Swiss-Prot record:
InterPro entries: ATPase_NBD, Chaperone_DnaK, Heat_shock_70_CS, HSP70_C_sf, HSP70_peptide-bd_sf, Hsp_70_fam
Organism of this sequence: Marinomonas sp. (strain MWYL1)
Disordered: annotated segments: 603-637
Family membership noted in the UniProt record: Belongs to the heat shock protein 70 family.
Protein name: Chaperone protein DnaK
Keywords linked to the UniProt accession: ATP-binding, Chaperone, Nucleotide-binding, Phosphoprotein, Stress response
Length: 637
């Protein structure tokens, strides 16, 4: 069994870790960074760029550069939060045939799990390069407040990337694992405040020593899957755009290129203001009108930034109140507060969290890496490399079915420890009813239509009977990933019908399988593309070196040699205009041969000319005289 890696698939950045001996280790990517931007770009030549390379070209390719796609995963196009996002991103968000939110790139419709899979592939490759072995299994983290369809979509992304997802684990729980595993014995209750790039979670977790086993029990969890650093960036972008409109009368919202530059500048300004009290946003040639080019220059102070985003920070405290209430605790019962997610570096966030919990958050947890480290520890628990650790997570939202009158009847309450199974008996609403529709729901509202619909199925062939007589047992079963199966059984006939909830939307098994095959085909294409680039680089280098040799040779090269070399160069340059790898290799070899004799002749002459010079040098060294020296200290200040 290979190693199980831990991946924090973030909205803004992703991170991969593995248990290396006794210690979990964050793995640096090919660029030498410990985190990778969760950005995927589709270049003009068809190449797929992931991470820093995608981020670097975002300004020149805004409509084909996809960021923060995690906010769309498992969501419907008509969701309010998706509609709000459409006007704020330069790329195109569209409705899929089943109503899901997808993206469109160069006329191609793509599902969010497909885009996330590109990021996961990069993390997989990063781990493989470090370990020197193939990686096929992973633990992937999700926001604790992700619903069933969002979890399922994340699992699909893993499958498309060629990973068997051994477990989906909640981000705050993973951070608690990273923090608590090496802490001294004794019981403690911690609050994990996780404000990342796109999502917010709060989890109250009890860490206890039970018979020598370290037990992490989630008491409650709450959050907002559309609140994060991206929203803070948006506030800055809106402010900069409004200031620019005030001074120039031009609305930058209609210009994707300007929007992308604003996004980069806004994010940079936000980060800078965590350590300084003022910064300047200077974007020359942001746009142009009939009077000529326009420049954006805005001073932004920390207090102005805080006034723009304070509402968002306060919005995060409501779930904290609810989580404490659900755990039946008060802020004073919390022993430690852990901050996770890059946005928690903001001084205002730290101040409000300190004020709310009445204690300073811990500073010894890396907010960018803790989640991936925790995921790798969970991977090691699953593979048996780490023992004496028990993780008890919860389902974040209540689960139930729609009953008469459009009411949601809850079977599993929110914050129930998982895995779990609950059953309840229902009956028919009309006389001689021969079928019932089971409509599974997730949420906290009493009105069924106000909750998230997870799926429907029918139980048919119920024997005719007066209403209320048939006994239909409905069972909800949640696995350790928080993914749900529902079954319904007619007690009289024993007939049973069940489904694994794939959500009323989501990707079908066939679609996922096709995407897996596409990804594998793309991997082969990528390999061929890489080989072609290497061959091209070798050819370019050969042309450059040969031309230099010709110049250096001057008259020493015969007319025949020059002609043969020039012909070989022309033929190789012609081959380079095609994508024919074999042809380029063949013409490179031909040039190597054509220039070989001249290169040898030049080398032999250079060698012959160097020998007398060496003799002279030796003689001059023999004549050297040792001299005394005196240190001069005049310049010493």
């Amino acid at each position: 069994m290979g190693r199980i890696i831990g991946i924090d698939l973030g909205t803004t950045n992703s991170c991969v870790a593995v248990l290396d001996g006794e210690k979990a280790r964050v793995i640096e990517n090919a660029e030498g960074d410990r985190t990778t931007p969760s950005i995927v770009a589709f270049a003009e030549d068809g190449e797929v760029l992931v991470g820093q390379s995608a981020k670097r070209q975002a300004v020149t390719n805004p409509t084909n550069t996809l960021f923060a796609v995690k906010r769309l995963i498992g969501r419907k196009f008509k969701d309010d939060v998706v509609q709000k996002d459409i006007s704020m991103v330069p790329y195109k968000i569209i409705a899929a045939d089943n109503g899901d939110a997808w993206v469109e790139v160069k006329g191609d419709k793509k599902a969010p799990p497909q885009i996330s899979a590109e990021v996961l592939k990069k993390m997989k490759k990063t781990a493989e390069d470090y370990l020197g072995e193939k990686v096929t299994e992973a633990v992937i983290t999700v926001p604790a407040y992700f619903n069933d369809s969002q979890r399922q979509a994340t699992k699909d992304a893993g499958k498309i990337a060629g990973l068997e997802v051994k477990r989906i684990i909640n981000e705050p729980t993973a951070a608690a694992l990273a923090y608590g595993l090496d802490k001294s014995s004794g019981d403690s209750t911690i609050a994990v405040y996780d404000l990342g790039g796109g999502t917010f979670d709060i989890s109250i977790i009890e860490i206890a020593d039970v018979d020598g086993e370290k037990q992490f029990e989630v008491l409650s969890t709450n959050g907002d899957t559309f609140l994060g650093g991206e929203d803070f960036d948006m506030r800055v972008i809106e402010y900069l755009a409004a200031e620019f409109k005030k001074s120039s009368g031009i609305d930058l919202h209609n210009d994707p290129l300007a929007l992308q530059r604003l996004k980069e500048a806004g994010e940079k300004a936000k980060v800078e203001l965590s350590s300084s009290s003022q910064t300047e946003v200077n974007l020359p040639y942001i746009t142009a009108d009939a009077t000529g080019p326009k420049h954006l220059n805005v001073k932004l102070t920390r207090s102005k930034l805080e006034s723009l985003v304070e509402e968002l920070v306060l919005k995060s405290l409501e779930p904290c109140r609810q989580a404490l209430k659900d755990a039946d605790l008060t802020a004073s019962d919390i022993d430690e507060v852990i901050l996770v997610g890059g946005q928690t570096r903001m001084p205002l966030v730290q101040a409000k969290v300190t004020e709310f919990f009445g204690k300073e958050p811990r500073k010894d947890v890396n907010p960018d890496e803790a989640v991936a480290i925790g995921a790798s520890i969970q991977g090691a628990v699953l593979s048996g490399d780490v023992k004496d650790v028990l993780l008890l997570d919860v389902t974040p939202l209540s689960l139930g079915i729609e009953t008469m009158g459009g009411v949601m009847t809850t079977l599993i309450e929110k914050n129930t420890t998982i895995p779990t199974k609950k059953s309840q008996t229902f009956s028919t609403a009309e006389d001689n009813q021969n079928a019932v529709t089971i409509h599974a729901l997730q949420g906290e509202r009493k009105q069924a239509s106000q909750n998230k619909s997870l799926g429907r199925f029918d139980l048919a062939d119920i024997p005719p009977a007066p209403r209320g007589v048939p006994q239909i047992e409905v069972s909800f079963d949640i696995d350790a990933n928080g993914i749900l199966s529902v079954s319904a059984k007619d007690k009289a006939t024993g007939k049973e019908q069940s489904i694994v909830i794939k959500s009323s939307s989501g990707l079908s098994d066939e679609e996922v399988e096709k995407m897996v095959q596409d990804a594998e085909a793309n991997a082969e294409e990528d390999r061929k593309f890489e080989e072609l680039v290497q061959v091209r680089n070798t050819a370019d280098g050969m042309i450059h070196a040969t031309r230099k040799t010709l110049v250096d040779a001057g008259d020493k090269a015969t007319a025949e040699e020059k002609e043969a070399i020039e012909t070989a160069i022309t033929e190789l340059e012609e081959a380079l205009t095609s994508n024919d790898k074999e042809k380029i290799e063949e013409k490179t070899n031909a040039l190597t041969q054509a220039s070989g004799t001249l290169a040898q002749k030049m080398y032999a002459e250079a060698e012959a000319g160097a020998q007398p010079a060496e003799g002279e040098q030796a003689k001059s060294q023999d004549d050297a005289v040792d001299a005394e020296f005196e240190e001069v200290k005049e310049d010493k200040k």
